A protein has these predicted regions:
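Membrane-proximal interfacial segments on either side of biological membranes
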Residues: 1-365
Length: 365
C-alpha cells in the first residue's frame, strides 16, 4: 500500500541558525560567514510513503519573506568593479519562492541589497538540477560607481546601470555565461556564450558587442563574432590606449586563455592610440597558439596619411620577433619623457624576446 501525505507549515519571523542547512548546502558554507538571517515562511509539502516507510515523490513549495540576511565574510572579490564593495553584504526584504521536486531545486526572488552603505536592487532565478546550476540574475546599480578597468569603462555614481548575468555552472566546475549585459543610458556592453574553465580562464567565446564612451569620453563601437574556430573584429571606433598601456606591462607567463588556438581578423575605421591621436582603417589579423599570441600583422594610416605597420611572430626557436615601423613617430613616442626632439621623421623598432629577455633596436631618423 502507498499512502499520500501532504501538509502546510507556517513559520513566524525568527532568527534562523544557518548551520542547520549544512547538509543541504554541503561545502558552500566553508567560505561564507553569515551573521544572521531573519524570515517568515509558508511551506506546502507532499510525498508518498509505502508500507516499508520509504518516502518518494517529495514535493516542497515555500514562500519565504526574507527580512534580513547578513553575510560578514564571503570569497567574492568584486572591489575592482564595485569600489564600495566589502566582504559584508546585506540583503533586505526579499520575496523568495522555493520549489523542490526530486533532483531539482528552483529558487526565484528579488529584493534589496546593500553594496557598502548604498542600497541597490537584485532579482534572481537559480535552478539546481542534479548538480548543474542554471542562473539568471539582474542587478540594478544606481547609487554605486561601476568600473571595468580593462575596458576603461566607468559608470558615474548618479547614473543607473543594469547588469544581467545568465548562465550555467556545470558539474565539472566550468562556467558558461550565456549572456552578460551591462546597460547604462546610451552605453552597452554585451557578451554571449563565454565559456570559462574551472580556473576562470577563457576557453571559448561567441559574441561581444561594445558600444560605450569610456573615461576619455571616446566612443568604443566594435563587434567580435565567432566563425567556426576563428573570429572577426569589426567596428566604427575603438580606444586602444588602455590596451597599449597594458601591453607594456605584459607578463608573458600569464594568460587569460585555456586551450585557445584561434585567428582574429580585424577591421576598425578609427583607432585611438591616446586621447588626441588616432589612426584610420586599421586592418590585419593576429593568431593565438596554445593560449599565447603567436603571430600578428596590423596596418593603419594616420589622419595626415602617414603609415604604420606592426608585426609579431614566434619562430621555431620560441623567439618572439616584433617589428614596428612608421613615418609619423610623434603620437607614438610623445608618451616617453626620455625621447625628445624626434617627433618627425621615421621610426623603426625591432625586438627579439626569449625566456623573458628582450634585445631591442630603436631607430628614429
Amino acid at each position: 500500500n502507498i499512502f499520500f501525505i501532504n501538509g502546510k507549515v507556517i513559520n513566524d519571523q525568527q532568527n534562523f541558525d544557518i548551520s542547520k542547512l549544512e547538509p543541504i548546502l554541503d561545502d558552500w558554507l566553508n567560505n561564507i560567514e553569515i551573521e544572521k538571517i531573519d524570515f517568515n515562511s509558508i511551506s506546502s509539502f507532499s510525498f508518498n510513503v509505502n508500507k516499508k516507510l520509504k518516502l518518494n515523490d517529495l514535493k516542497l513549495e515555500t514562500n519565504l519573506n526574507l527580512k534580513n540576511f547578513e553575510i560578514v565574510k564571503n570569497p567574492l572579490n568584486l572591489k575592482p568593479f564595485l569600489p564600495n564593495y566589502t566582504e559584508q553584504v546585506k540583503f533586505e526584504d526579499h520575496k523568495i519562492k522555493i520549489k523542490l521536486t526530486k533532483d531539482i531545486l528552483d529558487i526565484k526572488g528579488d529584493g534589496d541589497i546593500y553594496i557598502g552603505d548604498e542600497l541597490e536592487q537584485l532579482s534572481y532565478s537559480i535552478i539546481n538540477n542534479d548538480g548543474k546550476i542554471i542562473f539568471d540574475t539582474k542587478l540594478n546599480i544606481k547609487n554605486n560607481p561601476l568600473i571595468i578597468n580593462f575596458l576603461d569603462y566607468k559608470k558615474k555614481k548618479e547614473d543607473s546601470s543594469e547588469i544581467l548575468l545568465k548562465g550555467i555552472y556545470k558539474k565539472n566546475k566550468e562556467l558558461i555565461f550565456k549572456n552578460i549585459s551591462i546597460t547604462e543610458k546610451n552605453n552597452q556592453i554585451l557578451i554571449k556564450d563565454l565559456l570559462l574553465s574551472k580556473n576562470f580562464k577563457i576557453k571559448d567565446l561567441d559574441y561581444v558587442k561594445l558600444d560605450y564612451r569610456n573615461k576619455n569620453d571616446l566612443l568604443n563601437k566594435i563587434e567580435l563574432k565567432k566563425n567556426k574556430s576563428n573570429f572577426s573584429i569589426k567596428g566604427k571606433s575603438f580606444d586602444a590606449t588602455q590596451l597599449i598601456n597594458n601591453s607594456m606591462d605584459d607578463d608573458e607567463s600569464s594568460t587569460i586563455f585555456e586551450n585557445f588556438n584561434s585567428r582574429f581578423d580585424i577591421k576598425i575605421d578609427t583607432t585611438y592610440i591616446n586621447k588626441n591621436d588616432y589612426t584610420k582603417n586599421l586592418f590585419g589579423n593576429f593568431t593565438f597558439k596554445e593560449n599565447k599570441l603567436d603571430k600578428l600583422n596590423l596596418e593603419s594610416t594616420f589622419s595626415n596619411n602617414k603609415k604604420m605597420n606592426l608585426s609579431i611572430e614566434t619562430n621555431n626557436q620560441k623567439e618572439t620577433i616584433t617589428k614596428f615601423v612608421s613615418n609619423y613617430p610623434k603620437p607614438l613616442i610623445k608618451r616617453y619623457d626620455f625621447i625628445k626632439g624626434f617627433e618627425e621623421g621615421y621610426l623603426d623598432f625591432y625586438s627579439i624576446k626569449k625566456d623573458g629577455v628582450s634585445n631591442s633596436v630603436l631607430i628614429i631618423d
